[in-house]
Amino acid sequence: AKVTPERIAVVDAPGLGAGRKAVRFVVERAPNSFRSEISLPHEAGFRERWYAARVLVPEDWVFDPARARDIVMQWHAIPGNGRPTNPNLAISIGNEHWYVEQAHGDPAGKKVRTNTELGPVKRGAWVSWVVHAKWSPDESGVLQIWRDGDRVVDRTGPNVYGTIGVEYTPY
């Protein structure tokens, strides 16, 4: 879809004080309207990275239990022959709750998926997320996630697809 001011825009950050800015993403609940995102350039090899974002779920957000969860942030690796369809890591919302979703392993064979519920969404309140990932298809992988300064995920082990043919840090 074409980038338009209705889909993505820099705006004054609600409730964060004068001069504070935010990027507003809008995705209409309509057929063929499912994504609005920023992506980073891919990097060869698996890397250790830190990411941070503040997220505001508006007061008027509608949770639709008939739909899948809404992914708020995701990290995808470059797909290879197995064409993985699930992100290696996603922070999502559904049924009024936050979730961390992970997928790794062999996308053409034994894929491992986990879902962790992180508690209720507070509409109209900013949530600060910090993600520390040492991306790896083996036991050297690390995933730590903080929500508003509290560590909510602390895992070691595989966290990327290890057999896609090319190693890329998820973006």
Predicted segments with their positions:
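Low-complexity, Ser/Thr/Pro/Gly-rich disordered linker/stalk regions
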Residues: 1-171
